[in-house]
Structure formats: structure tokens, C-alpha cells
Amino acid sequence: MSQSTSVLRRNGFTFKQFFVAHDRCAMKVGTDGILLGAWAPVAGVKRCLDIGAGSGLLALMLAQRTDDSVMIDAVELESEAATQAQENINQSPWAERINIYPADIQQWITQQTARFDLIISNPPYYQQGVECATPQREQARYTTTLDHQSLLTCAAECITEEGFFCVVLPEQIGNGFTELALRMGWHLRLRTDVAENETRQPHRVLLAFSPQAGECYSDRLVIRGPDQSYSEAYTALTQAFYLFM
């Protein structure tokens, strides 16, 4: 199922097959989310969970990448963001496959019996500090409402034995997140360090954990080449989504 989007619209981000309005969401569509949605392993998955859905970007990207039989649940605590995510999904080709739940993930998870093959999250990572302009943005940026240990616990409670839990984080915070996950019994299976160009140190890291032990595959992704155009690797990863790639 596909739908080509060719007209640019305001107050959001136009992709090849869908549009994400984000003017009522604290955190906008950005490179982090696009990287995670394009990178997360989807082979063989039957059921996906997006924790902290925001505008619905990750749920929509997973829907585009997976078979029509794959169901996606997306949980978002902030009511305005959840409403906008639902509107974005309703206007997409995959409305029947994505369920948006305006809920606290820690409460929502206690009511679920289903297990997920893939859990994905672009989580908050700032410690409490300078106040944000709105409570919604503070909630999206800081770990006060869902710290990393709680996030890992929630994922552990509803993942299949061979499933993957995928996140994107700043490099140093990702290293701390990995140490915490390993202490909690997770196994790191995939790691991609992301740098802006060949001369820069990685500034983001994509991580995939599993309850099941196995070999860990690591690599490095450079976003831009020497001429500042997108690299071949980044283009190959994201060209199914970016409108002008």
C-alpha cells in the first residue's frame, strides 16, 4: 500500500508516502527520529510498540516498512500530541494498522497481555535543569516523567524473547543507557554510531537490545560527505522517506 505525497504543506514534515503535522507537539520531526525509524530491524516482526509516540512519526515509518499484517501500538502521555498523532495516522495509508493510546506507558503496560517483537522509542534524555517554555516541552525533553530505568523495565515487561528494543540517544548518554541495560539483563545486539561527517566524532548512537543473548553487530554511519551532500550510506538508509532523495 503506498501513497505518493508531492505537495509540501505547512506546520509539518512531508515525506514520500505520508505527512506529519507537528505544530501541536513539543518535539518536532528531526533527524534523530528519522534515523531510528529507518534503522530499526523489522524483519519478521508481527507486532510493534512505539513508546512516547509524539507526532506519530516512528509508528508511521514502521508501518511503511512492514507488511500489511503488522500491527503497531503507539503510546503517548501528552494529550495534544496524542491527538495530533491520531490525526496524522488517520490521514496516512495505514490508519487501520496503527493504534494510538493517550496514556502513561507504565500504567498502560500493566493492562497488556500481548508481546511485541519490536519496541521503539526516541526517549527524553536531559536531566532536570533549565525550565522549558511549556510543560509539554519539558515532558518531552526531560526524564522526570519516565526515567531510563523505568523505560527499560516497561520494555522488558512486554517484549518477546527474541524481540528488539531500539532507541536513539546522544553518544555519551547512550553509553550510560547501555551500561544500565546490561545491568538489568538486556543484551546489546546492534549499535550504530552516527557522525555528521568523517572528521567529526559521533554525536548520536542507535541501539538495539534484546532479552536474548547473541552477537553484537556495530558500525558507524556518516550523515554527510566532504561536499556536505548526504552520504551514500545515509541516502540508502533514508531515501524511502525523504521527499527529494
UniProtKB/Swiss-Prot annotation:
The reply to whether Cytoplasm figures as a keyword in the UniProt entry is yes
Q: Which CDD domains match?
A: AdoMet_MTases
Q: Which UniProt keywords apply?
A: Cytoplasm, Methyltransferase, S-adenosyl-L-methionine, Transferase, tRNA processing
Give GO BP annotations, semicolon-separated: methylation; tRNA processing
The EC number of this protein is: 2.1.1.223
InterPro entries recorded for this chain? Answer: DNA_methylase_N6_adenine_CS, SAM-dependent_MTases_sf, Small_mtfrase_dom, tRNA_Adenine-N(6)_MTase, tRNA_adenine-N6_MeTrfase
Q: Which Gene3D superfamilies match?
A: Vaccinia Virus protein VP39
Q: Name the catalysed reactions.
A: adenosine(37) in tRNA1(Val) + S-adenosyl-L-methionine = N(6)-methyladenosine(37) in tRNA1(Val) + S-adenosyl-L-homocysteine + H(+)
One GO term in the molecular function aspect is: nucleic acid binding
PROSITE patterns (alphabetical): N6_MTASE
List the GO terms this entry assigns under cellular component, sorted alphabetically: cytoplasm
What is the similarity comment for this entry? Belongs to the methyltransferase superfamily. tRNA (adenine-N(6)-)-methyltransferase family.
User: What is the annotated role of this protein in its UniProt record?
Assistant: Specifically methylates the adenine in position 37 of tRNA(1)(Val) (anticodon cmo5UAC).
State the protein's name: tRNA1(Val) (adenine(37)-N6)-methyltransferase
Protein source organism: Escherichia fergusonii (strain ATCC 35469 / DSM 13698 / CCUG 18766 / IAM 14443 / JCM 21226 / LMG 7866 / NBRC 102419 / NCTC 12128 / CDC 0568-73)
The top of its lineage is: Bacteria, Pseudomonadati, Pseudomonadota, Gammaproteobacteria, Enterobacterales
